[in-house]
């Protein structure tokens, strides 16, 4: 069993996102091929977005740093550090109002 410093990882990913042409960086904490549970830390530089995409399974989003906007259809929620939301089972997008880091947890099909 290995522990991960999410604070340190968030700082590193945010630095990478600021320097990336896409304005984002991510690291898979758990999951991948053969795992139903997948967790990733995603950093977005302020003003950057993850464009609208499908939700491939049950998913939650926890904001670690910053402030983001989750949009799903007509529903919009703005979340700040320490807040959590269940992502609706529909197409959605994520926009960073400022430099932000989120923890995405997903239970999909194998």
Walk through the language-model features, giving the residues of each.
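A short, N-terminal "cap"/entry segment at the start of jelly-roll beta-barrel domains
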Residues: 1-36, 71
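A cytosolic small-molecule/anion-sensing beta-strand core signal
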Residues: 64-65, 80-81, 98
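Short acidic-glycine-tyrosine-enriched beta hairpin
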Residues: 73-89
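Ligand-binding loop in jelly-roll beta-barrel domains
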Residues: 89-110
């Amino acid at each position: 069993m290995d522990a991960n410093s999410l604070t340190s990882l968030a700082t590193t990913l945010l630095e990478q996102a600021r320097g990336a042409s896409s304005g984002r960086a991510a690291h898979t904490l758990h999951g991948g091929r053969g795992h139903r549970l997948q967790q990733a830390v995603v950093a977005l530089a302020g003003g950057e977005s993850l464009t609208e995409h499908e939700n491939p399974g049950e998913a939650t989003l926890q904001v670690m740093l910053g402030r983001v906007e989750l949009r799903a259809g007509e529903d919009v929620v703005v979340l700040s550090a320490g807040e959590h939301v269940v992502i609706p089972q529909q197409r959605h997008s994520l926009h960073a109002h400022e430099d932000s880091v989120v923890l995405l947890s997903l239970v999909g099909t194998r």
